UniProtKB/Swiss-Prot annotation:
Glycosylation sites: 191, 226, 378, 438, 479, 587
E.C. number: 3.4.24.-
Keyword field: Disulfide bond, EGF-like domain, Glycoprotein, Hydrolase, Membrane, Metal-binding, Metalloprotease, Protease, Signal, Transmembrane, Transmembrane helix, Zinc, Zymogen
Primary gene name: ADAM20
Membrane topology term: Single-pass type I membrane protein
Residues in the Cytoplasmic compartment per record: 715-726
Cellular compartments per GO CC: external side of plasma membrane; plasma membrane; sperm head plasma membrane
Protein name: Disintegrin and metalloproteinase domain-containing protein 20
Function noted in UniProt: May be involved in sperm maturation and/or fertilization.
Length: 726
């Protein structure tokens, strides 16, 4: 691949731009570390089964490990946001042709957790290979654990990573604090317009950094030219780095991997500043059009330079400066993860720590010298927060699977314009009986995917494809000519349901139902005085919404539409993290509720749901008690001749034995939107419905037999009585 001439030309242009006005480059100096710092200990993790009141919530695993002269109990649960859906992996042929695959990735074997009884401890492990691989941080000590592959007794090796100068020489960033400060002054003038960005939504702390990792050819060769090995190394490193960022409410999500399996398209040895510059140019022309990302990092196995990594400070989302280069010299995952965490911190606006910067440990991740640590300092928090607010919201929403790919082509498992299907790679298509490699249907196949497609054929008309969920929902059936299930339709807003409730957007809500969902079946909605007292306070326990950073007090007419208040609570539920239960005594009443504070990225279980009754002929709509008059009256029971119910598209969904559109003529039910229901009502029943139906059929003979026995017994008693009288 010829890259020399265009790189030189573009490099000169970019140097003039970068030197005067853009982002500073930071670097970590490098030494020649030994393979591991201490002799390992052999440990055998033992699973701990928790019982009784001390049992962990579902989804947690607990193991006991003994090392360093002590026994530790590790609690961990699956890290669910590590990968983007359908993670693409790019490789190259010997002729430098691009190949793309979406390999099966076991996404339920990467864990985050903590050590029992050790505040601020941190655990990041994977169990994908059958044993534990990853990091344990206990107080000021950091350990790396690896399984012994040939062990028949689940043995592992635990290495303590020391910070002694004799084993971990002091390594200095290649950029001085003075130079960073000077370049930041230049950057402030360049980024002036960014300071005017909208602050809407800034209080939601949760951020999602979409990371693409590129692995150079030398590192690939070091991994025995095994792309799968490279992938697993990347997964484990990113899982560890993600654990560093969780206290900042940041999820680092891997959205793609690019492995230079043929050769390096640019020099990766020598001065890392040049490597970073060249990589930024390469990314701009080769990666941006393929993968969505906030930042891209190049992993290299450099053994000549004197730096561990470089990155553009505040480069996040600022193409082409949203890049970093990290030296992955050996197999020490934890040590390299600290380097990646540091360089990614620079991308997010963090500078090197000064003497006034502190964290829970002796050293912090953004220290100018490389230190064994897992915590960010107070300075890093402040710099990240300032940088995130001022640079917009590019890292706020999680990646949507459909947006990961930017290059439309046959073979990416996404059915695009002009394609009948897309079975993916050659290997995947070989196993697909319905779709061909050229994204057309196999001869004789009617479909290749969809709820209403089975064995390459459309499911028969009247096959249930979407079951009714609750009394405010409606079922849908396949039409026999399409692979898709009809759009989801539900009962029209404003139709009564349950007791003193109305359907609204597919659900039946009232205050009592919500209290039972939170506090159990005995709970019920509190008196109106609780709503009046609490929801007019304008705090996290009682409010009618959030504007900017301020909780809005409820006006008296809207108090029933703020936060739900309950009574008759006997049990405090296990709520999601960051949730708080409030008990408030008001005269002879105890009011119970939950909080919702700024920065929470989980659903608010305590806000009164839209559609909840708040007065006669009134329901809550967006924290306001609104009249139901505004709800559509285009369809009413009379429209359906009292033989059906109106759906959200203002069409009649007819009862069985009546036909749409107005339930006037004989038919089989359904609506113009639901697809045709089965002619035999039994065909439309779900599995549970069929079981209940069959159970009833089985009971009928038994009931008949019992009635017969009672009849015989009655006749005998009557005859016996007549004999006695005679």
């Amino acid at each position: 691949m010829a890259v020399g001439e265009p790189l030189v030309h573009i490099r000169v242009t970019l140097l003039l731009l970068w030197f005067g006005m853009f982002l500073s480059i930071s670097g970590h100096s490098q030494a020649r570390p030994s393979q591991y710092f201490t002799s390992p200990e052999v440990v055998i993790p033992l699973k701990v089964i928790s019982r009784g009141r001390g049992a962990k919530a579902p989804g947690w695993l607990s193991y006991s490990l003994r090392f360093g002269g002590q026994r530790y109990i590790v609690h961990m649960r699956v890290n669910k946001l590590l990968f983007a859906a359908h993670l693409p992996v790019f490789t190259y042929t010997e002729q430098h042709a691009l190949l793309q695959d979406q390999p099966f990735i076991q996404d339920d074997c990467y864990y985050h957790g903590y050590v029992e009884g050790v505040p601020e401890s941190l655990v990041a492990l994977s169990t994908c290979s059958g044993g534990f691989l990853g990091m344990l941080q206990i107080n000021d000590l950091v350990y790396e654990i690896k399984p012994i592959s040939v062990s028949a007794t689940f043995e592992h090796l635990v290495y303590k990573i020391d910070s002694d100068d004799t084993q971990f020489p002091p390594m200095r960033c290649g950029l001085t604090e003075e130079k960073i400060a000077h370049q930041m002054e230049l950057q402030l003038s360049y980024n002036f317009t960014l300071k005017q960005s909208s602050f809407v939504g800034w209080w939601t702390h949760q951020r999602f950094v979409e990371l693409v990792v590129v692995v150079d050819n030398i590192r690939y060769l070091f991994s025995q030219s095994n792309a799968t090995t490279v992938q697993h190394e990347v997964f484990n490193v990113v899982n560890i780095v993600d654990s560093f960022y969780h206290p900042l409410e940041v999820d680092v999500i891997l959205t793609g991997i690019d492995i230079w399996t043929a050769s390096n398209p640019l020099p990766t040895s020598g001065d890392l500043d040049n490597v970073l510059e060249d990589f930024s140019i390469w990314k701009n022309y080769n990666l941006n059009n393929r993968l969505q990302h906030d930042v891209a990092h190049l992993f290299i196995k450099d053994t000549q330079g004197m730096k561990l990594g470089v990155a553009y400070v505040k480069g996040i989302c600022q193409n082409p400066f949203n890049t970093g280069v990290d030296v992955f010299e050996d197999n020490r995952l934890v040590v390299f993860a600290i380097t990646l965490g540091h360089e990614l911190g620079h991308n997010l606006g963090m500078q090197h720590d000064t003497q006034w910067c502190v964290c829970e440990l002796q050293w912090c991740i953004m220290h100018a010298y490389r230190k064994v640590t897992t915590k960010f300092s107070n300075c890093s928090y402040a710099q990240y927060w300032d940088s995130t607010i001022s640079s917009g919201l590019c890292i706020q929403p999680p990646p949507y699977p459909g947006n990961i790919f930017r290059l439309k082509y046959c073979g990416n498992l996404v059915v695009e314009e002009g394609e009948e299907c897309d079975c993916g790679t050659i290997r995947q298509c070989a196993k697909d009986p319905c779709c061909l490699l050229n994204c057309t249907l196999h001869p004789g196949a009617a479909c290749a995917f969809g709820i209403c497609c089975k064995d390459c054929k459309f499911l028969p008309s009247g096959t249930l494809c979407r079951q009714q969920v609750g009394e405010c929902d409606l079922p849908e059936w396949c039409n026999g000519t399409s692979h898709q299930c009809p759009d989801d339709v539900y009962v029209q807003d404003g139709i009564s349901c349950n007791v003193n409730a109305f359907c609204y957007e597919k659900t039946c809500n009232n205050h009592d139902i919500q209290c039972k969902e939170i506090f159990g079946q005995d709970a019920r909605s509190a008196s109106q005085s609780c709503y009046q007292e609490i929801n007019t306070q304008g705090n996290r326990f009682g409010h009618c919404g959030i504007v900017g950073t301020t909780y809005v007090k409820c006006w008296t007419p809207d108090i029933m539409c703020g936060r739900v208040q309950c009574e008759n609570v006997g049990v405090i539920p296990n709520l999601i993290e960051h949730s708080t239960v409030q008990q408030f005594h008001l005269n002879d009443t105890t009011c119970w509720g939950t909080d919702y504070h700024l920065g929470m990225a989980i659903p608010d279980i305590g806000e009164v749901k839209d559609g909840t009754v708040c007065g006669p002929e009134k329901i809550c709509i967006r924290k306001k008690c609104a009249s139901m008059v505004h709800l559509s009256q285009a369809c009413q029971p009379k429209t359906c001749n009292m033989r059906g119910i109106c759906n959200n598209k203002q069409h009649c969904h007819c009862n069985h034995e009546w036909a749409p559109p107005y339930c006037k003529d004989k038919g089989y039910g359904g609506s113009a939107d639901s697809g045709p229901p089965p002619k035999n009502n039994m065909e439309g029943l779900n599995v549970m419905g069929k079981l209940r139906y069959l159970s009833l059929l089985c009971l009928l003979p038994l009931v008949a037999f019992l009635l017969f026995c009672l009849h015989v017994l009655f006749k005998k008693r009557t005859k016996s009585k007549e004999d006695e009288e005679g």
